[in-house]
Amino acid sequence: MGKYFGTDGFRGEANMNLTADHAYKVGRFLGWYYSELKKRNGIDGPARIVIGKDTRRSSYMFEYCLIGGLVASGADAYMLHVTTTPSVSYIARVDEFDCGIMISASHNPYYDNGIKLINSCGEKMDEETISYIENYLDGEVELFGEKWTEVPYAHKDKIGCTVDYVSGRNRYI
């Protein structure tokens, strides 16, 4: 377990120890990281990241912040809207997304929320990637042989797109 991410994601009381700024920065890092991995592996196109959320009031805020970070970094954000964690895992795997994000605090009180990260296989994100995110949230991450205090923004036609992907959710539910 890290400073922010516990056994099942980054959880906390909305706008107290889990803020809109945290969500934006998680989106910024993931959008850049997966776009950079694709580029370094000779794969064309933007990173593709799928997002779902539960019905908590703060889930909408966190969704918009995550999406803002993702597209600012050049990733395409696919929105499943209100859905379940298993549906995000399923769609991340079968539709070959770079990763998935679920905004939910499961059984915790309504004022809490969380950001769960899912890899391309539909499983919990690996600890190494989570440690990169935590280091970025703390102000500096060492990755690809460099130290990053801020990751680059995408420009012009490299800015990511948002995609309404309710059809993906409907295939699962």
Predicted regions and their residues:
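Short, surface-exposed, polar/charged, turn-prone segments marking secondary-structure boundaries
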Residues: W32-Y33, A77-L80, S106, E127-Y132, ...
